[in-house]
Amino acid sequence: MFQIGEALMGQGSELAHVDLMIGDKGGPVGQAFANGLTQLSAGHTPLLSVIRPNLPPKPSTLIIPKVTVKNMDQAAKIFGPAQSAVAKAVADSVEEGVIPKDQVEDLVVVASVFIHPEAQDYNKIYRYNYGATKLAIKRALEGFPDINKVLEESNKSTHAIMGFKVTRLWDPPYLQVAFDNPNLEFVLSAISQIPNSDHVIIEAGTPLIKRYGVDVISKIRQVRPDAFIVADLKTLDTGNLEARMVADAAGDAIVVSALAPISTIDKLIEEAHKTGIYAVMDTLNQHDPISVLKQLKVMPDVIELHRGIDIEGTEHAWGNIGEIKKIAPKALIAVAGGVRLDKVPVALGQGADILVVGRAITNAKDVREVAEQFINALNKPEIDQFRVMTDF
């Protein structure tokens, strides 16, 4: 057996975070246990867990402090409430049948325990570490999380200490608000009026990017830190370089023109994926996007079927979305140009995943009100709107 578990519990300086391994004495966990007990490290001295002095639990459990212990006051928090809490959690896990009683002499546990140097309340240190250890053991032996849970939660989660959310496009449809006005003050004011929604994307349009460069992304981030921001460069050359520029500027997606050479599009997509951002292929003036897609080594993340501002007065269609999805089944389809409120049901009915709207929102007298109308037309609830966040 070689199982791994993790759990975080509590709040404030007494918050507990436990990483642990549980496995056979003769396996890698047993080897790690023996190494830890015999190869001491200054400030991270391993110690056996004990319910009280002279009463260790079974399976035998080794505690390793994560934070460097610098004085006896900090040591007392480990050699006391944390040591006892971990031991009691192991013993109770046996009593409750989580750890099989007939295997306690064959198994060992190695637990890495976090104690903040500023933690003061011994009662909370004990209770939080008890709960975190017990939960980590249960998760380890149940194989939690399984891969389906990981994939389900990975795009929802925000690391509490990181302090911001990295938004991904996994729950379409979305409204993409395109800011083509090169007046930065106007753009930032309008962005501040866009409702916070899981289904809104912010686009730094081509004129805005041309005037201020990709550094405008950081200005937008100051107004909307968690937004998914698309940089509409309409790249025609040096695809890998421009993708890297957008990634370095903390953008979430870069737009490449479908008129660019195939090698440029390929390099841009490869670099975008390497740096963790989305690659968007804009089909403006490309009359045969399917032919382009068939020549690519890797599909873009988003394919934008685009009618330009200069020709919006004419009748149009957004192309054969069904055929495109057959070639690029994992790609999201965006439609741009002439997307007005009455066209939303039509676009969604044709299979669009992203509706790109510019002046209909950004030039409105009441930006917030019009944006809310488009968001409501998506008929999509907020992600986890009614979820009480406890275990995740």
Swiss-Prot record:
It catalyses: 5,6,7,8-tetrahydromethanopterin + formaldehyde = 5,10-methylenetetrahydromethanopterin + H2O; D-ribulose 5-phosphate + formaldehyde = D-arabino-hex-3-ulose 6-phosphate. Its EC number is 4.2.1.147, 4.1.2.43. CDD domains: KGPDC_HPS. Keywords: Carbohydrate metabolism, Lyase, Multifunctional enzyme. Pathway: Carbohydrate biosynthesis; D-ribose 5-phosphate biosynthesis. InterPro entries: Aldolase_TIM, Fae/Hps, HCHO-activating_enzyme, HCHO-activating_enzyme_sf, HPS/KGPDC, OMPdeCOase_dom, Ribosomal_Su5_D2-typ_SF, RibuloseP-bd_barrel. The keyword Acetylation does not apply. The keyword rRNA-binding does not apply. One of its GO terms (biological process) is carbohydrate biosynthetic process. It is an enzyme of class 4 (lyase). Residues 162-392 are annotated as: 3-hexulose-6-phosphate synthase. Substrate binds at residues 19, 48, 66, 68, 83. The active site is at residue 17. Residues 1-161 are annotated as: Formaldehyde-activating enzyme. One of its GO terms (molecular function) is carbon-nitrogen lyase activity. Signal peptide: none annotated. Catalyzes the condensation of formaldehyde with tetrahydromethanopterin (H(4)MPT) to 5,10-methylenetetrahydromethanopterin. Catalyzes the reversible formation of ribulose-5-phosphate and formaldehyde from 3-hexulose-6-phosphate. In the N-terminal section; belongs to the formaldehyde-activating enzyme family. In the C-terminal section; belongs to the HPS/KGPDC family. HPS subfamily. NCBIfam families: one_C_fae (TIGR03126), PRK13307.1 (NF009833). This is Bifunctional enzyme Fae/Hps. It comes from Methanosarcina acetivorans (strain ATCC 35395 / DSM 2834 / JCM 12185 / C2A). The lineage of its organism: Archaea, Methanobacteriati, Methanobacteriota, Stenosarchaea group, Methanomicrobia. The gene is fae-hps.
